[in-house]
Design a protein with these regions (language model features):
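Multi-pass membrane glycosyltransferase architecture that uses lipid-linked
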Residues: 2-276, 313-489
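Periplasmic/ER-lumenal interhelical loops and adjacent helix-loop junctions
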Residues: 270-314, 324
Length: 489
């Protein structure tokens, strides 16, 4: 290993000069930027470009839903599936009581689902959208308007995510194009309300990268009040802060998260416990469902897997433990984004259900963990296959004797495509952790651009001799070093 040298240049990393796929794709707009091109000085900088691209892709996703918006949500048993434009949003407007001005969590809903089965902040988001929806006209018109209002609010969330991802790695703003141009982002953004929690999570990660540990915790607490998965990031930071000895920063994050979560949840918990707890009881009692590895096993074996809850919880804990062990034994402390991606991916892969919009949880994390277009597009291809597979399978099982759509064997192939491509991207990230010279983010000498207080910090606790190996020579100033390695994938 050659001696480390300091990096003084703050010039943004240009993916077209490092990534063959990005360079080839740039030919559509004039080719890669030249070595001596002048950067900066123009109001349309990388962050604004990324945000505009994300808004444009979101709008394309809305166009893709146009057949459903005009008629397929409201006519026929399978039209919304054969056109692959299904969304929960218009359907839940009526069946969850928003059309009747029922108050989420407080008012009982007629039908099988007695209370809204979403966390509190997501319920508030849904309620605000219902306030902005015109109360006159036919039910079809009101459902269309409710979807449109939600789409506008979710577009704002998408722009926030794009900006936060672009700003998290200071020298790599263009990596956020992985999020903005992701096919699965455009296809799934308006299926459900997941972008709210993702926006809060992305904002939290930006704050952590800037050393704002308590504000990070507040945003993660609010994100957890909108969706459960963001709390996993606290587990990631527990291990990383353990290795780096940054307990004060971790404590501030935990206190901020707990306080924000309680502020968001406590009023509803106290005043409407049964309605508030519905999300948690529903998640616990829910049987295996579409897209999960457990459904694939059940269909192939004929075993209903009544204990899938136990299996899913046990496997998730096992994988999280393995990821924690990886973090404490790796030759170099893993980057925050790498472990965050692995833990959330483990949660998704082990879950009892995989809704197609869950891919949105991973896209920003993937852009930060492994900003390499080839690997990203391989994964996205598997997710697009699953996106089409679930809708065509639902068309098949709802079309009666017509058998219109994808039979169960084809749907199982779609599930396998999702599982295998996600595992592939996880394997590449693990490879980067074990062999840091393959990590494209660290190629310029950076340590952990999203790590905040962890960036450049010395290790104080490790579990392996490889992790105890001293670094060549700590730089006297700055946190970025150059290992002297050539380009690698």
């Amino acid at each position: 290993m050659t001696p480390m040298t300091k990096v003084h240049e703050d010039r943004p990393v240009l993916p077209t000069q490092q990534d063959e796929v990005a360079a080839a794709g740039s030919e559509l707009i004039g080719g890669p930027l030249g070595r001596y091109a002048r950067l900066g000085g123009h109001w349309l900088g990388p962050v604004r470009v990324v945000a505009l691209v994300a808004i444009g892709m979101f709008a394309l996703g809305m166009v893709q839903k146009l057949p459903c918006y005009e008629w397929a949500w409201f006519q026929g048993a399978t039209s919304q599936y054969t056109h692959a434009c299904y969304s929960d949003i218009p359907h839940l407007y009526a069946v969850r009581g928003f059309a009747d001005n029922l108050t989420p969590y407080f008012d009982r809903i007629p039908g099988d689902m007695e209370y809204l089965e979403y966390p509190v902040l997501t319920g508030l988001f849904m309620e605000i959208a219902s306030w902005l929806t015109p109360g006159s006209g036919t039910m079809q018109h009101r459902e269309q308007m409710y979807w449109m209002v939600n789409a506008g609010m979710l577009m704002a969330c998408a722009a926030v995510i794009a900006v936060c991802v672009a700003r998290t790695h200071r020298r790599r703003p263009w990596d956020a194009l992985l999020f903005a141009l992701a096919p699965a982002f455009a296809l799934t953004a308006t299926i459900n309300w997941d972008l709210l929690a993702i926006a809060l999570t992305a904002a939290g990660m930006l704050m952590w990268s800037r050393g704002r540990t308590v504000l990070f915790g507040v945003l993660i607490g609010l994100a957890t009040a909108a969706k459960l998965y963001p709390v996993l990031l606290l587990g990631v930071l527990f291990v990383l802060c353990w290795r780096a000895g940054k307990w004060r920063a971790f404590g501030g994050a935990v206190l901020g998260a707990a306080g924000a979560w309680l502020v968001a949840n406590l009023p509803v918990m106290v005043l409407a416990w049964e309605g508030w707890s519905k999300f948690y009881t529903f998640s616990q009692e829910r049987p295996i469902d579409f897209g999960s590895v457990w459904l694939l096993i059940s269909q192939r074996s004929g075993n209903p897997l009544h204990d899938a809850n136990t299996y899913a919880t046990g496997l998730t804990l096992l994988l999280c433990g393995a990821i924690g062990l990886l973090a404490l034994t790796a030759p170099r402390r893993p980057r925050f984004a790498q472990l965050a991606f692995l833990v959330v991916a483990a949660f998704i892969l082990c879950n009892k259900v995989y809704s197609p919009q869950y891919v949105l949880w991973l896209i920003p994390l993937a852009a930060l963990a492994r900003p390499r277009w080839r690997d990203f597009l391989i994964w996205q291809a598997g997710e697009v296959v699953y996106f089409l597979g679930i809708w065509f399978y639902l068309a098949y099982i709802n079309s009666g004797d017509k058998h219109q759509g994808l039979p169960v064997e084809g749907y199982q192939v779609a599930i396998a495509a999702h599982l295998l491509t996600t595992l592939y991207l996880c394997a590449v990230v693990v490879r980067d952790v074990l062999l840091p010279e393959h990590d494209v983010v660290r190629r310029d000498g950076s340590d952990d651009p999203s790590g905040g207080v962890l960036d450049g910090a010395e290790d104080v606790f490790v579990l392996s001799d490889a992790a105890r190996a001293p670094r060549e020579a700590a730089p006297s100033e700055g946190q970025r070093v150059d290992w002297g390695t050539g380009p690698r994938d």
